[in-house]
């Protein structure tokens, strides 16, 4: 009998294949009283070391398949394993209570998980709880001599079905064999969804109970376009899904033909389509997908992948490689955005109740502790500027005085280099990321002093709606098309244009096919997104009329009260 489920369409594509249940092993154990505590400590050390090596191998594979940025999630896992305080506490329980390593590990990690999960208003700490859970499973499996599931060993075409996919699971997926995956939980912004889109594997998440309904080897039909999953599809349904898959493949082939085309609308207006990157290795994907620029280079990954602060020369080489790889096309480099969910093992960040609203990004750069790091990065960028078209962007700016302070340091380092006889490019644009509502509201004043704006919608939306996008209980409030968000964005674009400056966007919204027509109508100049979204967005823009999109955005801004009304209006104008 055919059963149909509906979930969240998290990664586009269609697949029909047998189910592969990714079941976690039984990690239950008995608490034992032991006399030889030294032996238990040695068992713990061995399990930690093996887990560390295993994670490094998984990360190395993930770098190859997903890229440096997506693979950086494993750094957080390895930091948990290397945490001397946690290890010391586990060993203290072994010695004080005379219990086996399994019991001590579970007691200490459960304590940390409970504390972090209790911080319901703090997404960063809740993510750390998820990291500890993933790591605990791995260490416990090694202590028990149990094998964890290994998606890397799959050697036939399957659709993975799981409660959820951990980052380490997703990093092992080979899209030659894994045709899609479906989970009980998760959404479009979860790690597994982001990785699925990077790998271009169809995914449907948040089905609630698919693991209870599916058996190993059962035939499934999955649409990452609509969020539909059919169990035991009929011959007719299989045919419909195959047709939908063929149509999507044909559509992708049409998009690929636009690689070297200009992004021009039906009425001849040009918009710049750019891509976001995390490392120099990502430049190849930018060029392969025909992006006209890099709209966001997240430089913090240079710091997160190092054992100590990267030197000026190390940074110079990285920036030079990116600029040269783009062959004169614009590259917007964001200065380091550490803090929040991005920590460094060699830089002591304070434990804060809410690090996303705390000491991070430019706030660190402008502090006494961060001044040296900031100046080193600016010098490296200025030296590299002669190798391409560099633009520099400061993140997390709330005050005009913050921008002035950062620009003053930039000017000082530029003057020093020139005095030293080091060549520096002329006309480097210096702008800010608009991700704090205060900056969006004061955009008219910022526009008098900056060279450009880049709107970071991921944070702007959650800060404006007072809703943590990782908290499922309030995820309904994370609304990119809410009229309040659209009005803020419009305010920023109009303020930039009033001063003869350009405005771009580098959040997820820039490649959102519902948002793009609205943003076109508002006059957004540059759209920066994941490289794999560039060609689809170019195809959409080429069939739209910019004047008609201006009518659309004007109506949405003046007449709509809800997100649903905005979506209906977009559908009416773009059908």
UniProtKB/Swiss-Prot annotation:
| Highest taxon of source | Bacteria
Q: Which reaction does it catalyse?
A: L-histidyl-[protein] + phosphoenolpyruvate = N(pros)-phospho-L-histidyl-[protein] + pyruvate
One cellular component term (GO) for this entry is:
cytoplasm
Question: What triggers or suppresses the expression of this protein?
Answer: By response to the carbon source.
Q: Where in the cell is it found?
A: Cytoplasm
Gene3D superfamilies attached to this UniProt entry: Phosphoenolpyruvate-binding domains, Phosphohistidine domain, PtsI, HPr-binding domain
List the EC numbers from the record: 2.7.3.9
**Which residues hold phosphoenolpyruvate?**
298, 334, 458-459, 469
UniProt KW Kinase keyword = yes
Q: Which UniProt keywords apply?
A: Cytoplasm, Kinase, Magnesium, Metal-binding, Phosphotransferase system, Sugar transport, Transferase, Transport
Under the heading PROSITE patterns, the entry gives: PEP_ENZYMES_2, PEP_ENZYMES_PHOS_SITE
Assembly, in brief, is: Homodimer.
Domain remarks in the Swiss-Prot or TrEMBL record:
The N-terminal domain contains the HPr binding site, the central domain the pyrophosphate/phosphate carrier histidine, and the C-terminal domain the pyruvate binding site.
Q: What else is known?
A: The reaction takes place in three steps, mediated by a phosphocarrier histidine residue located on the surface of the central domain. The two first partial reactions are catalyzed at an active site located on the N-terminal domain, and the third partial reaction is catalyzed at an active site located on the C-terminal domain. For catalytic turnover, the central domain swivels from the concave surface of the N-terminal domain to that of the C-terminal domain.
What protein am I looking at? Answer: Phosphoenolpyruvate-protein phosphotransferase
Q: Which organism is it from?
A: Lactococcus lactis subsp. cremoris
Taxonomic path: Bacteria, Bacillati, Bacillota, Bacilli, Lactobacillales
Gene symbol here is ptsI
């Amino acid at each position: 009998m055919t059963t149909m489920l509906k979930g969240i369409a998290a990664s586009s594509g269609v697949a029909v294949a047998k189910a592969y249940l990714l079941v976690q092993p039984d990690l239950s154990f008995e608490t034992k009283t032991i006399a030889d505590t030294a032996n238990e400590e040695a068992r713990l050390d061995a399990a930690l070391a093996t887990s560390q090596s295993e994670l490094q191998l998984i990360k190395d594979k993930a770098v190859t398949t997903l890229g440096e940025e997506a693979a950086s999630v494993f750094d957080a896992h390895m930091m948990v394993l290397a945490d001397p305080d946690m290890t010391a506490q586990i060993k203290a329980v072994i010695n004080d209570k005379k219990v086996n390593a399994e019991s001590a590990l579970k007691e200490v990690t459960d304590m940390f998980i409970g504390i972090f999960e209790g911080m319901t208003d703090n997404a960063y700490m809740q993510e750390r709880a998820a990291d500890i859970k993933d790591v605990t499973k791995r260490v416990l499996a090694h202590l028990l001599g149990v094998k964890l599931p290994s998606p890397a060993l799959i050697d036939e075409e399957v659709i993975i079905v799981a409660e959820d996919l951990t980052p380490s699971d997703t990093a092992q997926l080979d899209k030659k064999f894994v045709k899609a995956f479906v989970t009980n939980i998760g959404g479009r912004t979860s790690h597994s969804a982001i990785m699925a889109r990077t790998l271009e594997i169809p995914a449907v998440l948040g089905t609630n109970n698919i693991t209870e309904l599916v058996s190993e080897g059962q035939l499934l039909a999955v649409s990452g376009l609509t969020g539909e999953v059919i169990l035991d599809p009929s011959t007719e349904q299989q045919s419909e899904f195959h047709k939908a898959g063929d149509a999507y493949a044909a559509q992708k082939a049409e998009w690929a033909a636009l690689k070297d085309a200009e992004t021009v609308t039906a009425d001849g207006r040009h918009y710049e389509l750019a891509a976001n990157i995390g490392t120099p290795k990502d430049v190849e994907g930018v060029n392969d997908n025909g992006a006209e620029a890099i709209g966001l280079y997240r430089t913090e990954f240079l710091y997160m992948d190092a054992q100590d602060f990267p030197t000026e020369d190390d940074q110079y080489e990285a920036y030079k490689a990116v600029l040269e790889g783009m062959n004169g096309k614009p590259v917007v480099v964001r200065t380091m955005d550490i803090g929040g969910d991005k920590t460094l093992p060699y830089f002591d960040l304070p434990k804060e109740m809410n690090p996303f609203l705390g000491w991070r990004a430019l706030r660190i750069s402008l502090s006494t502790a961060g001044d040296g790091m900031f100046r080193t990065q600016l010098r490296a960028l200025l030296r590299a500027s002669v190798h391409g078209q560099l633009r520099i962007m400061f993140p997390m700016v709330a005050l005009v005085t913050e921008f002035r302070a950062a620009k003053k340091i930039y000017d000082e380092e530029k003057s020093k280099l020139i005095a030293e006889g080091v060549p520096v490019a002329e006309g480097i644009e210096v702008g800010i990321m608009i991700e704090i509502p205060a900056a969006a509201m004061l955009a008219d004043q910022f526009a008098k002093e900056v060279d450009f704006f880049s709107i970071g919608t991921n944070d702007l939306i959650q800060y404006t709606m007072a809703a943590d996008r990782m908290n499922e209980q309030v995820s309904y409030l994370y609304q990119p098309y809410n009229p309040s968000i659209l009005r803020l964005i419009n305010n920023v674009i109009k303020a930039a244009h009033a001063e003869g400056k350009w405005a771009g966007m580098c959040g997820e919204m820039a490649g959102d096919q519902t948002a793009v027509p609205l943003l076109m109508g508002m006059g957004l100049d540059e759209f920066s997104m994941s490289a794999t979204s560039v060609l689809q967005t170019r195809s959409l823009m080429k069939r739209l009329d910019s004047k008609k999109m201006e009518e659309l955005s004007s109506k949405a801004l003046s007449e709509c009260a809800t997100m649903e009304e905005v979506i209906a209006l977009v559908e009416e104008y773009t059908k």
